[in-house]
UniProtKB/Swiss-Prot annotation:
Organism: Geobacillus sp. (strain WCH70)
Name of this chain's protein: UPF0309 protein GWCH70_1414
GO BP terms, alphabetized: carbohydrate derivative metabolic process
Family designation: Belongs to the UPF0309 family.
CDD domains: SIS_RpiR
GO MF: carbohydrate derivative binding
InterPro entries noted in UniProt: RpiR-like_SIS, SIS_dom, SIS_dom_sf, SIS_GmhA/DiaA_subfam, UPF0309
Length: 247
């Protein structure tokens, strides 16, 4: 099963690279333009999707102007089952999105593999209403196999400016075995992390080729990195308060 899982993950990644290449390039261009014009990159996901927002935040080798939006009741540590139930509530997103500093010069990623629950959909709609370019990473196969739980009847991919398909299967579990009664082993996290890091890698090069120094974190475990990082954090701390611990 170890080799089988590696094979299946590689198949998903190859599908993304083959079929989503132009969307990945477009996302990278939009990200690079936003940062050069003073914007930031904001991300939101519920449950396990929020892991992707943390993967790229305050990351060695990653972009500095990254702002994840955390609403702890929708994360797992305050009650995993409860978080799943809350994600299904229409208009709940307004409780934490109304006062978020989202601007027209920003890019906003919404991450949801099923794409059917109200909270991610409302988050995407709010980001768009505030003028941010909104990119969704989702599974079209999964989304199209299930009815929307949003009051509009729409799925997440239907409300985005740009959609990137992560090619997760329905239910996200990619493996099966004759001795196991249900499918198992998800792919959305490893593929989603790869998608985001690939987009940001391309965006970094686009900025550099345009004569703009990309704001990149060095690992804090390298001597001299703190001075480098603190100078860039100073530039973005007001827009990304959680970089320095402000709520």
């Amino acid at each position: 099963m170890i080799e089988r899982y590696f094979q299946k993950v590689n198949e998903r990644l190859e599908l993304v690279l083959k079929n989503e290449r132009e969307n990945l390039k477009k996302a990278a261009y939009v990200v690079s333009e936003a940062i050069q014009k003073g914007g930031i990159i904001q991300l939101f996901g519920c449950g396990h999707s929020h892991i992707l927002t943390e993967e790229v935040f305050y990351r060695a080798g990653g972009l500095v102007p990254i702002k994840p939006i955390f609403f702890e009741p929708l994360m797992l540590h305050e009650g995993a089952v409860r978080s799943s139930m809350l994600e299904r509530i229409n208009d709940l997103a307004h409780e934490f999105m109304a006062d978020e500093d989202i601007r027209r010069e920003d890019v906003f990623f919404v991450l949801s593999t099923s794409g059917r629950n109200p909270v991610p959909i409302d988050v995407a709609l709010t980001a768009k209403n505030k003028g941010a370019y909104t990119i969704v990473i989702t599974s079209l196969e999964y989304s199209m196999s299930q009815p929307s739980r949003h009051k509009s009847g729409k799925l997440l991919y239907e409300v985005a400016d740009l959609v990137i398909n992560n090619y997760s299967v329905k239910g996200d579990a990619i493996l099966s075995h004759e001795s196991v009664s249900v499918p198992f082993s998800p792919t959305s996290t490893v593929v989603g992390c790869t998608i985001l890091n690939a987009i940001f890698a391309e965006a970094i090069v686009l900025m550099a080729e345009n004569g703009f120094e990309p704001p990149i974190f060095l690992s804090g475990n390298i001597e001299g990195a703190d001075d480098h990082n603190n100078k860039i954090i100073e530039k973005y701390k007001d827009r990304i308060p959680i970089l320095i611990g402000k709520s």
